[in-house]
A protein has these predicted regions:
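Conserved active-site and cofactor/substrate-binding residues in soluble primary-metabolism enzymes
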Residues: 2, 13, 35-43, 71, ...
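Acyl-CoA/ACP chain-elongation machinery
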Residues: 21-35, 64-73, 90-141
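Condensing-enzyme catalytic core mediating Claisen C-C bond formation in acyl metabolism
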Residues: 1-53, 60-61, 176-177
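Conserved beta-strand positions
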Residues: 61-64, 157
Length: 177
């Protein structure tokens, strides 16, 4: 990741543009996320607002924190719905890179942001592998088992950490401006 000026000066291939960021900290519990997802929703909403996300025009890809645990996944589903509204949340294509890579602790956020940029660039939503019996509380499009082609315009990557440290980065597909 570097400034546009620097990337253009050296002739680098540009995959996506960082257009938004949000963060929150709720200190709800040492390890458990807030059960209603309210603090995480603030980080997601901040990033989407800063990115000027328009649910009527943009096709959104969400790289969920998605740890595959009942507490995290239901809380994150609620957070997405609160941040975007139910209708827009149902249009989003969501996946968990962790289903492919496992949880890499400190490296996870960077790897998932790179995966999000590549998804935008190639127009491919990676699958959430192993998702055969979703939790009824996780009722959004979590792209189970199979990758999908899509003309994505915006991606967000959620990192929801211990102690309620929540971060969300928004990317926009690079159009070569």
């Amino acid at each position: 990741f570097e400034s546009l000026e620097s990337a253009q000066k050296r002739g680098a291939k540009i995959y996506a543009e960082v257009v938004g960021y949000g963060n929150s900290c709720d200190a709800h519990h040492f390890t458990a996320p807030h059960p209603e997802g309210i603090p995480a929703s603030r980080a997601i909403k901040q990033a989407l607002d800063e990115a000027k996300f328009d649910a009527d025009k943009d096709l959104l890809y969400i790289n969920a924190h998605g740890t595959g645990t009942p507490l995290n996944d239901s809380s994150e589903t609620k957070a997405i719905k609160i941040a975007m509204g139910e209708e827009a949340a149902r249009k989003a294509m969501i996946t968990s890179t962790k289903s492919i890579t496992g949880h890499m602790l400190g490296a996870t956020g960077a790897v998932e942001l790179i995966a999000s940029a590549l998804s935008l660039y190639h127009g491919i939503v990676t699958p959430t592998i192993g998702l055969t019996n979703p939790d009824p509380e996780c009722d959004l499009d979590y792209t189970p088992l199979k990758a999908r082609k899509a003309d994505l315009t915006v991606a967000i990557s959620n990192s929801l950490g211990f102690g309620g440290h929540n971060a969300c980065v928004a990317l926009r597909k690079w159009e070569g401006k």
